[in-house]
Amino acid sequence: MDFKQYSPEELKECSMIEVVHSVLGDKKQATTFNELVQEIAQVLGLSQEQVNAKIAQFYTDLNIDGRFINLGENRWGLRSWYPYEQIDEEILPQPKPKKKRKVEEDGFDDYIDEDEDDFDDVDGNEDEDDDVEDLDKVLEDEDGDDDDLDDLDEDEDDFAEEELEYDETEEEEEEEL
């Protein structure tokens, strides 16, 4: 492509990728990235500041566009120049996916946070306060039931004494045999 036939307005509308494609096509040899950038700046009439502002996006576009290939050492060429068998790109072996282990079901449901009451919210509900007071009264009434517990303790002591007597009689019977 001859850029002399285009007007300056038409050249400004050309993308950097289109210019690189035609430059590489005219040269018919791989070129370093820095040389490509210099030629683009010359053809499009870009200042160094404009080039610096666009260089990152240009490099990204160059990598993404399937028409170009990086030959190493920052040299770029057209992919159409190289048959697939000749391309000496670094090919990394793909790791084999690991086999998934069968997870045993534990029988428990997963904890769902939605069911949990939000105790941090204050809604001004007085009914809850009444429930707490009722529970306090019930607990006070249960405190007086300690007498029943004492009776149970005495029953356990009596049972333990009977058990000891039984063990002694068993031992005597075994000795007689």
From Swiss-Prot:
Gene Ontology biological-process entries: DNA-templated transcription; regulation of DNA-templated transcription
| Key words, A-Z | DNA-directed RNA polymerase, Nucleotidyltransferase, Transcription, Transferase
**Highest taxon listed in the record's lineage:** Bacteria
GO MF annotations in UniProt: DNA-directed RNA polymerase activity
A Pfam family for this UniProt protein?
HARE-HTH
Per the record, where are the segments of Acidic residues compositional bias? Answer: 106-177
Question: A GO CC term?
Answer: DNA-directed RNA polymerase complex
Keyword Cytoplasm attributed: no
Q: Which Gene3D superfamilies match?
A: RNA polymerase, subunit delta, N-terminal domain
Which PROSITE patterns is this protein grouped with? HTH_HARE (PS51913)
- Start and end residues of each stretch annotated as Disordered: 93-177
* Stretches assigned to the HTH HARE-type domain: 14-81
Keyword Transport assigned: no
**InterPro entries xref list:** Asxl_HARE-HTH, RNAP_delta_N_dom_sf, RpoE
Its quaternary structure?
RNAP is composed of a core of 2 alpha, a beta and a beta' subunits. The core is associated with a delta subunit and one of several sigma factors.
Please name the HAMAP family in this protein's record. Answer: RNApol_bact_RpoE
Function, as annotated: Participates in both the initiation and recycling phases of transcription. In the presence of the delta subunit, RNAP displays an increased specificity of transcription, a decreased affinity for nucleic acids, and an increased efficiency of RNA synthesis because of enhanced recycling.
Q: Which family does it belong to?
A: Belongs to the RpoE family.
Q: What is this protein called?
A: Probable DNA-directed RNA polymerase subunit delta
Query: What gene name is listed for this protein?
Result: rpoE
